[in-house]
C-alpha cells in the first residue's frame, strides 16, 4: 500500500473543504468589493452631477446615505451633561487650587464665585483670542445693551462708567436663597436669542465659559448683561468709591460682576469670552471650588480678593487687552450709544454721577472682582434688587468646574466636546510603594568568606597587608577582620562598619554569608620567607584594624659597607622593628653574577702593582678594612641585604654608589702569577676609557667562592677608585712622559697577553658563562703575543706602581727598557717616539687606559684589532691600511659608464657572458645599470648588424 492509498481520502476531503471555503471567501470579498466600488462610483457620479446641476432621483438614496455617514451635524449643547455632574478635576500634588483661581467665602457663608483672573497664565489666551472674543462680544453688546441696557465696554473704559446692568429679560433673578439653576436660564428666555445673534466665536467662547461652572445657570454671554470692564482709571475710581467695581482683567476679563452687598458676584465678564454667570450662580458655582479656566478663558480673582490681586491682574490684563479693545473701537461707539441709553436709568456712571451708579448698583452688581465686594453700596445706593440677591448655592464638589462646551443653540461651528466624567467612587491610584528605609547600622556586618577565618587563624597575615574587603556594595567597604581576631578588634571593626554603613543607607537587606576572605598572598620574591615571617609574627597580633602597608617617610639609616655583615644585621633588626613591613623599594641588590674561580685560585696573594698603581695612594691605607668583599656575607640573608640596600639607594649620594659588576669576560687561567696583571683582549679593545689597567680585576672581584683575604682586601679598593676618580688628580706629567707611559702600558699588556695565551689552558665554562658571553657580541679573538718579549722572570716591575713622588723616573726607566721593542701592529719603534707628534695619530695607546693618562695626553686612538698569531718577526701592517684590506676593492664605477656608451651592441648571449664575468666584482654597481645592459632587445642588435 502506497502513501496515496492510505491517505487519499483525507487528502481529497481536505482539498474539498479548503476549496469550498476558499471559494466562499473569494466570492464574499469579490461581492463586497464590487458593491463598494459601485457605491463609490455612484457617489462620485452624484457629486459630479450635483456640481454640474444634474441629479438623478436614483442617486438620492446614495446621497442620503452619504449625508448620514459623512456629514456630521453639530451636537446640541443642551443635550450635553450638566457640568455640575462632573467631579472636580484632580489637582497636581501639592496644588491646592488651580492657577489664578481664588475662592472667597461670602459673609453669609455662601461660596463666592471662584473668578478666573489669570488670563495671562493661559498660553492659548493670546491677543488673537482676545481680539476674537472681543469682537464678537462687541457685536453682542448692542443686543445686550438694547435688551438689558448694558453699557458697552468702550464707553466704560473711556468714561470710567461702570455699567452694572442686571440681566434684563423681564425677569427677576430669585434671591440667592433660591435655586440658581431654575432662576438662571429657564427664567431668561431671551438669552438664547441674543446668543443666536452672537457670532460663532462668541458662542464658542460663551460655551466654554459656561462650561467653567456657570453653565448651571445657563448664562448666555450675550443674553445676560455682558458688562464690559472699566479701564484701570475706572477701576481706581471704583476702588476709591468702595462701590461695586468693574475690574477689567486684561483682555480676557473685562470685569467681574461685584455685588454692592458683597454677598453675590456676577460671573466675570471676560473681554474675549465674558463669562457672565447670573447673580444667582456664584453660590451655585461651588463653595470653595476652584473654577478651572475654560478654553481661552482667564481666571479672574475672587471679588473678595485684595485690591492688589485684583488690580494687578486687572492692569496686567488690561495692558494685554488694549490691543483688542482698540481693534473693536469701531463697534464700541454704536454700542456705547445704545448702552448709555439703556444704562441711563439702570446703571450709574462712576466718576460722573453717584445717582447713576447707585441706580446701576441697585439694578445690577458691579462687574469686577475688587476687594470692595463685601462692602455695601456707597452713599445712598439702594440695596441690591431681589433678583440680584445671592441664591443658595447648589451643593457641588470643590473644584467641580470643567470647561465644558457651551449649550448654545447656534448650529454653526460649535465643536463637539465630550468630557469623560470622573468617577469619585473609583479607587484612587495607588501611591508608589514606599520602600522603608532601614537603618544600616542595625544590620549585621556583611558576610565573610567561609575559608577566610580558618586560614588567618592558622597563619597570621603579614602586617599591614590585610586589605579591606572591597565588594560591589559600598556598605561593605570597611575591612572585615577574620573571625579569629580578638574581641576588641571585632568590636572596633563592627563600630567602623556601622558608622560607614549609616552614611550609606541605600544598601538594604541582611547578609548572613561570611566573607572574611584570606588576603591574597604577597608577591613572590626570592628569599623573602624568613624576613616577612619575622615582621608578621611581631606585628600581626598588635593590629586592631587592617590597614594599608605603612609608607615610611623617615630616611633610613646610612647604608653599611657591603662587607660589614654584622652592621647590616643590626640595621635590619632595627628597621624591622620600626617598619611593619619592608617598603617595596627595599630590595636587596641582585645576586652577584657568577665568576669562574680558576683565575682566582691561580692568582697570587699579593696585590698587583699595576692595580696598586691605579688604586692605592698614600694616606689611604684603611680602605681595605672598610671594604670587605660582599661575597663573604653569608648567603642565608641575601634578601635582607637587598631589601636594606634598596631602602637606602635613594638616600645615598651618587658618589657613594658601588660600581656595578663588570660584564663577564672569559678569563683564561695561567700557571704563572703574571696572569693577575694582564688585561684581556676584549677588555683592551672594548674598554670604556675608565682606567681598565687599575680595575681589570673587577670582573673577578664578585666571585662568591673566593676566600682569599688579600684578594678581598685588594678588590675592596676597586669601588673606591671610582670615588677617588672624582677627586683632584695628581699633577699631570709632561707630554713626553705621558707618551712613554702610554706606550709602555700597551706593550706590557701585549706581552702579558701573549704569555697568558701560551701558558694557560682554556677553562671549562659553565652554562651561565656561556649565556652571559652570548649576551654581547663575541670579542675579537686574542692572538698570541710575541714570544721574545717578556719582563724579567715575568715579574711585574714594581716601578710601575704609581706614587705621588718619583713617577716620572719610573716611567723613564720603563721607556728605556722597552725602547728596543716595536709596538704591536705598527712599524714605529719606541726609540722614535720621543716627543714626536706622530704618536698622537698613530700611537696605539689603548682606549681603555685610565683617563688620567689617556685623555690628558691626547693620544686616544680607535680600539686595536685583535693581535695576529703570526710570528713576532713579521711586521704588522699599518693600522690605517687594515680597513682597506678587509674587503675587496670594487671595480671603479665611473669607468664602466663610458664603456657602455662606446661599446657596440652585442648579442644578448655575449652580453650575458660579459655581465657574468663581472658579476662577482660589481656588487656595488647600480643594479639598474646591469639590468639595462641585459635587456637590450635582440631585434635592435640585428638591425644594427644589418646596417
Curated annotation (Swiss-Prot):
Keywords of the record: Membrane, Phosphoprotein
Record field: compositional bias (Pro residues): 379-395, 862-879
Composition bias type Acidic residues, residue spans: 59-69
Region annotated Disordered, chain positions: 1-334, 354-810, 824-904
Encoding gene, per UniProt annotation: AIM3
GO CC annotation terms, alphabetical: actin cortical patch; membrane raft
Highest rank taxon of the organism: Eukaryota
Full protein name: Altered inheritance of mitochondria protein 3
Amino acid at each position: 500500500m502506497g502513501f496515496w492509498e492510505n491517505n487519499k481520502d483525507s487528502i481529497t476531503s481536505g482539498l474539498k473543504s479548503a476549496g469550498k471555503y476558499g471559494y466562499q471567501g473569494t466570492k464574499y470579498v469579490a461581492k463586497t468589493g464590487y458593491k463598494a466600488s459601485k457605491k463609490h462610483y455612484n457617489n462620485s457620479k452624484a457629486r459630479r452631477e450635483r456640481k454640474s446641476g444634474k441629479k438623478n432621483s436614483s442617486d438620492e438614496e446614495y446621497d442620503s446615505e452619504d449625508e448620514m455617514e459623512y456629514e456630521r451635524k453639530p451636537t446640541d449643547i443642551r443635550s450635553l451633561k450638566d457640568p455640575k455632574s462632573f467631579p472636580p478635576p484632580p489637582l497636581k500634588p501639592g496644588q491646592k487650587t488651580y492657577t489664578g483661581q481664588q475662592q472667597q467665602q461670602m459673609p453669609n457663608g455662601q461660596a463666592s464665585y471662584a473668578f478666573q483672573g489669570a488670563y495671562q497664565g493661559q498660553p492659548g489666551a493670546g491677543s488673537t483670542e482676545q481680539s476674537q472674543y472681543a469682537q464678537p462680544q462687541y457685536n453682542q453688546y448692542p443686543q445686550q445693551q438694547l435688551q438689558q441696557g448694558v453699557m458697552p465696554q468702550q464707553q466704560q473704559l473711556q468714561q470710567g462708567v461702570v455699567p452694572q446692568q442686571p440681566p434684563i429679560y423681564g425677569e427677576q433673578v430669585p434671591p440667592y436663597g433660591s435655586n440658581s439653576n431654575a432662576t438662571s436660564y429657564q427664567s431668561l428666555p431671551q438669552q438664547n436669542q441674543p446668543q443666536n445673534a452672537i457670532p460663532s466665536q462668541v458662542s464658542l467662547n460663551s460655551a466654554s465659559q459656561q462650561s467653567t461652572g456657570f453653565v448651571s445657570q445657563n448664562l448666555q454671554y450675550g443674553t445676560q448683561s455682558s458688562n464690559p470692564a472699566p479701564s484701570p482709571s475706572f477701576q481706581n475710581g471704583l476702588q476709591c468709591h468702595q462701590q461695586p467695581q468693574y475690574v477689567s482683567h486684561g483682555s480676557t476679563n473685562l470685569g467681574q460682576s461685584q455685588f454692592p452687598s458683597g454677598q453675590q458676584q456676577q460671573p466675570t465678564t471676560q473681554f474675549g469670552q465674558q463669562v457672565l454667570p447670573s447673580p444667582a450662580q456664584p453660590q451655585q458655582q461651588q463653595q470653595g471650588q476652584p473654577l478651572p479656566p475654560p478654553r481661552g478663558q482667564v481666571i479672574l480673582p475672587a471679588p473678595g480678593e485684595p485690591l492688589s490681586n485684583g488690580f494687578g491682574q486687572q492692569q496686567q490684563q488690561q495692558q494685554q487687552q488694549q490691543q483688542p479693545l482698540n481693534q473693536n473701537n469701531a463697534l464700541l461707539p454704536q454700542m456705547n450709544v445704545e448702552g448709555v441709553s439703556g444704562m441711563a436709568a439702570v446703571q450709574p456712571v462712576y466718576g460722573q454721577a453717584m445717582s447713576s451708579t447707585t441706580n446701576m448698583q441697585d439694578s445690577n452688581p458691579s462687574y469686577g472682582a475688587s476687594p470692595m465686594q463685601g462692602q455695601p453700596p456707597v452713599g445712598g445706593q439702594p440695596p441690591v434688587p431681589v433678583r440680584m440677591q445671592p441664591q443658595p448655592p447648589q451643593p457641588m464638589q470643590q473644584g467641580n468646574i470643567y470647561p465644558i462646551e457651551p449649550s448654545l443653540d447656534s448650529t454653526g461651528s460649535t465643536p463637539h466636546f465630550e468630557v469623560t466624567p470622573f468617577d469619585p467612587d473609583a479607587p484612587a491610584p495607588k501611591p508608589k510603594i514606599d520602600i522603608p528605609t532601614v537603618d544600616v547600622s542595625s544590620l549585621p556586618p556583611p558576610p565573610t568568606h567561609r575559608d577566610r577565618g580558618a586560614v588567618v587563624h592558622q597563619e597570621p597575615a603579614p602586617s599591614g597587608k590585610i586589605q579591606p574587603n572591597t565588594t560591589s556594595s559600598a556598605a561593605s567597604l570597611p575591612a572585615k577582620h577574620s573571625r579569629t581576631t580578638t574581641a576588641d578588634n571585632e568590636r572596633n571593626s563592627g563600630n567602623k562598619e556601622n558608622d560607614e554603613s549609616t552614611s550609606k543607607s541605600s544598601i538594604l537587606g541582611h547578609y548572613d554569608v561570611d566573607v572574611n576572605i584570606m588576603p591574597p598572598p604577597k608577591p613572590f620574591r626570592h628569599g623573602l620567607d624568613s624576613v616577612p615571617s619575622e615582621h608578621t609574627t611581631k606585628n600581626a597580633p598588635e593590629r586592631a584594624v587592617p590597614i594599608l602597608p605603612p609608607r615610611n617617610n623617615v630616611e633610613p639609616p646610612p647604608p653599611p659597607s657591603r662587607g660589614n655583615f654584622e652592621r647590616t644585621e643590626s640595621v635590619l633588626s632595627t628597621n624591622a622593628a620600626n617598619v611593619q613591613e619592608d617598603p617595596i623599594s627595599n630590595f636587596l641588590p641582585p645576586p652577584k653574577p657568577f665568576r669562574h674561580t680558576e683565575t682566582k685560585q691561580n692568582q697570587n696573594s699579593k696585590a698587583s702593582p699595576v692595580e696598586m698603581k691605579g688604586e692605592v695612594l698614600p694616606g689611604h691605607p684603611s680602605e681595605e678594612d672598610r671594604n670587605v668583599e660582599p661575597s663573604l656575607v653569608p648567603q642565608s640573608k641575601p634578601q635582607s641585604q637587598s631589601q636594606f640596600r634598596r631602602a637606602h639607594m635613594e638616600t645615598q649620594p651618587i658618589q657613594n654608589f658601588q660600581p656595578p659588576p663588570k660584564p663577564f669576560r672569559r678569563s683564561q687561567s695561567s700557571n704563572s702569577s703574571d696572569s693577575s696583571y694582564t688585561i684581556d683582549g676584549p677588555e683592551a679593545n672594548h674598554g670604556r676609557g675608565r682606567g681598565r689597567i687599575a680595575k681589570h680585576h673587577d670582573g673577578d672581584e664578585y666571585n662568591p667562592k673566593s676566600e682569599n683575604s688579600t684578594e678581598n682586601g685588594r678588590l675592596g679598593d676597586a669601588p673606591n677608585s671610582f670615588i677617588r676618580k672624582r677627586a683632584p688628580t695628581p699633577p699631570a706629567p709632561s707630554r713626553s712622559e705621558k707618551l712613554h707611559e702610554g706606550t709602555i702600558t700597551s706593550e706590557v699588556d701585549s706581552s702579558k697577553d701573549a704569555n697568558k695565551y701560551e701558558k694557560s689552558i682554556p677553562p671549562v665554562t659553565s652554562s651561565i658563562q656561556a649565556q652571559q658571553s652570548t649576551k654581547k657580541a663575541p670579542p675579537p679573538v686574542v692572538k698570541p703575543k710575541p714570544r721574545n718579549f717578556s719582563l724579567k722572570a715575568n715579574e711585574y716591575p714594581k716601578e710601575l706602581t704609581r706614587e705621588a713622588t718619583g713617577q716620572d723616573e719610573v716611567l723613564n726607566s720603563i721607556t728605556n727598557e722597552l725602547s728596543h721593542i716595536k709596538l704591536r701592529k705598527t712599524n714605529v719603534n719606541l726609540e722614535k717616539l720621543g716627543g714626536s707628534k706622530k704618536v698622537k695619530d698613530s700611537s696605539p695607546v689603548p682606549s681603555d687606559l685610565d683617563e688620567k693618562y689617556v685623555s690628558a695626553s691626547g693620544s686616544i686612538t680607535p680600539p686595536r684589532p685583535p693581535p695576529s698569531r703570526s710570528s713576532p718577526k713579521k711586521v704588522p701592517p699599518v693600522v690605517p691600511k687594515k680597513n682597506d684590506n678587509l674587503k675587496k676593492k670594487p671595480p671603479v664605477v665611473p669607468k664602466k659608464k663610458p664603456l657602455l656608451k662606446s661599446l657596440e651592441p652585442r648579442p644578448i648571449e655575449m652580453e650575458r657572458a660579459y655581465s657574468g664575468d663581472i658579476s662577482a666584482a660589481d656588487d656595488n654597481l647600480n643594479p639598474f645599470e646591469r639590468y639595462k645592459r641585459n635587456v637590450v632587445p635582440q631585434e635592435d642588435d640585428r638591425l644594427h648588424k644589418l646596417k
